Amino acid sequence: MFSFEGDFKTRPKVSLGGASRKEEKASLLHRTQEERRKREEERRRLKNAVIIQSFIRGYRDRKQQYFIQRSAFDQCTDSAQPGGTFCLADGPNLTLLVRQLLFFYKQSEDSKRLIWLYQNLIKHSSLFVKQLDGSERLTCLFQIKRLMSLCCRLLQNCSDDSLNVALPMRMLEVFTSENTYLPVLQDSSYVVSVIEQILHYMVHSGYYRSLYLLINSKLPSSIEYSDLSRVPIAKILLENVLKPLHFTYSSCPEASRHQVFSAFTEEFLGAPFTDQIFHFVIPAFADAQTVFPYEPFLNALLLLESQSSKRCSGVPWLFYFVLTVGENYLGALSEDGLLVYLRVLQTFLSQLPASPTGTGCPDSTSDSEDDNEETDQPNSPEDGRVSAPYITEECLRKLDTKQQTNTLLNLVWRDSASEEVFTRMASICHTLMVQHRMMVPKVRLLYSLAFNARFLRHLWFLISSMTTQMITGSMVPLLQLISRGSPMSFEDSSRIIPLFYLFSSLFSHSLISIHDNEFFGDPIEVVGQRQSSMMPFTLEELILLSRCLRDACLGIIKLAYPETKPEVREEYVTAFQSIGVTTNSEMQQCIQMEQKRWVQLFKVITNLVKMLKSRDTRRNFCPPNHWLSEQEDIKADKVTQLYVPASRHVWRFRRMGRIGPLQSTLEVGLESLPLSVSEERQLAILTELPFVVPFEERVKIFQRLIYADKQEVQGDGPFLDGINVTIRRNYIYEDAYDKLSPENEPDLKKRIRVHLLNAHGLDEAGIDGGGIFREFLNELLKSGFNPNQGFFKTTNEGLLYPNPAAQMLVGDSFARHYYFLGRMLGKALYENMLVELPFAGFFLSKLLGTSADVDIHHLASLDPEVYRNLLFLKSYEEDVEELGLNFTVVNNDLGEAQVVELKFGGKDIPVTGANRIAYIHLVADYRLNKQIRPHCLAFRQGLANVVSLEWLRMFDQQEIQVLISGAQVPVSLEDLKSFTNYSGGYSADHPVIKIFWRVVEGFTDEEKRKLLKFVTSCSRPPLLGFKELYPAFCIHNGGSDLERLPTASTCMNLLKLPEFYDEALLRSKLLYAIECAAGFELS
């Protein structure tokens, strides 16, 4: 506690010890610095005090002067009443009043004074304007500007009901009209200059913001452009909006013009549209009678966008305005104006928010009824503004109009079209497909370009000719960089990705409609006239093009999995900063977008490559081994690590995830250990481009994967748990269908042991060590796929495909039969069994495809006659309606005719020249897909229950047929000899065996095949040679009875050969046996 002892002054501290000579250096320096700091703080405090005092004195004086001038103004207004001494009909007096008001004006206190002054200025406008012709012209011009600025500020409070906006609006009208100035000043050029200066000052003072608020406040929300003549204020407001634009367009310098358009854009068009703007103002601007400087506006808009450091939030509304108003001005644009228009479309379309519903893209996930209902409502319920999603949809719809499409197509198709035109057009199309998820058939611009051969050729030429400068100074094609897997700069990728994506997408779409005859350049004669081809490339050009596309895909895979950890290079940072990206989070977002663009590019190129490969598979146009890549050397013994036992997906399978030249992080599914870069690349190739690997290697990989899975399921021991079934030989299919159903045996990967009963119900001799099961499975598949069974039919070429009428035969359980047959075929593949089942190509394609649907080009393998008729209809040049077709097909199943509508109400829709393409594709889709969809889906599910479809997708339809039935190649006797076993006293040196091989060497290839079928039940050798045959081919001593015929046990691949020492006798007996297919019962 402190006490007061009478001292009220601080006394200096006196050190009685004297000055210490031992003061340390650090202490001295610290004390000196502290004293200096205190002196500096004192000086700053005094300076700040002077500033504050000066401000207070100025504020007090201004308040005093405001009061004095306001009082003087009020005295003048009082004196200006009738009978007063102050005359308003005098220019200097008006100038004095204006000067006073401008000095003290405060909107909260002086609004009424301003209104009174406006009233008198309008009344005596000529006297006031006359001051512009005297010595006070600059002062008068400044006063008019300030008055108009206050007028704009006043109108911004138009929502206040107490404010009468008539006088401020009349003020705007009077003092921006030439009629006010010309009678007084008489110099028209000076008048125009004065009005321009006034308008520019007003624009800087929020003129368009005031008009925006005024329109939304004073016009009813239900107003439309047709109401213009009935609502006088609407016409005045519209004129006021256009006035600065017209003056700006006529004679204003470019910089000032840009300022006016900038204000108009940001303050009037940049905000979400209200009903008044959307339904009245925009249609008014779009009216041809309303003259609007559209081309200068586009130039200013492009300049404004280039100078902006960040994206404008009002892009949807600006873009809608550009498209809507441009409908009446596109035809009048100059060539330079059209190029500017193209740039504006490219810029704003890329900034347009992604479409919320898409337009039928498979990737679209917003397809619920609620979402659709929301987008149908233009206004949001909160504030009556038109929503951004609705405007976005409207922009995309307007961009797809016939006029817009023709304008853009004319730009591209003209002979003088530059590389910039093609590049920007590609960017627009790329944005439509990628960002807005619009499909080629749904957009008029896209499908028009897709079927223009000249455009596609030129597009590929641009892609091939794009180059970049390397560090060494040499120019290298960008396509070559991609093929090498070399990273490229952000600018280079932005140049080539849109072009490459567009080319791949459009060419893929055009290939769907180009039938094989047209693709291969065969002449097409219809009604005596030769049809023009839509093929943009010759077969020779396609060979080179397909090789480039293949290498590009492989290069992108290398970019996805770089050998060294990638870094964000300096040029990427610079490129991102140039578009306003500064923070790390924004940069990472841009990097992810760049990665996504590479992924999307990879997908469309891969799709195009697969389509070309499919054509080559159906009818070869490429040289042998064309699709094999010399860059990739994938061996079966190097990919065993791709099998993951724990996951039971038995495949480290993933589609291409986030890939790009910037970062290598892929979303990985279930896996045990991380893969190396080489393994990642191999996996990507095997899943996306398997045909670049030789077929033999893929077969080895497939068999190794099967073996690895079998080791997990069955194990090595012969007595592990398996499946034991008893089957009656005369009822193989019925018993197997019952006892091997999913309910009884959910896992067919287990080892199956079969016990057969003969026709009399007695046990057949023998214990199943694998051979009886193979014989059982072979007979089961023959029975199940026999057309007489009713589940499969044959084409004209004898190829199997699901019977559409199967449901009529077995009822609703037909899908279970197809599931069962799929499982059995999968079991044959799983056990490496060859079965001679010739399937139709389109059916195998449906099994391998991810969508289970195939296109019209496969129709020829199902019904060549229908295919030819549809091609005839496509090229028919007479009146199509005369053919009397409608959107129906007729099924004749089991003698019963049934009419099926291809679309709702199809029987009442005639086929015309306009809709025949749709009819053709609907017919093909019905025959190939809809009619047998449940059959194929059930069969696929059964097949996938035993063998992963991802493994099978390493092969095309022809290769799968070879995998099922073996290749039609000559039987190699040397290979067969090398892997033949002998029993019962025979050996390789036995005389009978030597005679046997001499006899077989003299057989024709057909006779050798019959021998092979006689012993193994399959006429084709194993894919990888007889070393893969299990059990091995074996010749057993059949005894010395020369009257007996050679017999075979196909379940054991065993030939029982009697001891024929006479070559002629052995030949005749053996040929008789194989021709008659002698078994146990024929001796």
Swiss-Prot record:
Q: Where is the IQ domain?
A: 45-74
Carries keyword Transcription?
no
Matching PROSITE patterns: HECT, IQ
Q: Which Pfam families match?
A: HECT (PF00632)
| Active site feature | 1051 (glycyl thioester intermediate)
UniProt function note: E3 ubiquitin-protein ligase that specifically catalyzes 'Lys-29'- and 'Lys-48'-linked polyubiquitin chains. Accepts ubiquitin from the E2 ubiquitin-conjugating enzyme UBE2D1 in the form of a thioester and then directly transfers the ubiquitin to targeted substrates. Associates with the proteasome and promotes elongation of ubiquitin chains on substrates bound to the 26S proteasome.
Q: This chain belongs to which protein, by name?
A: Ubiquitin-protein ligase E3C
**What organism is the protein native to?**
Mus musculus
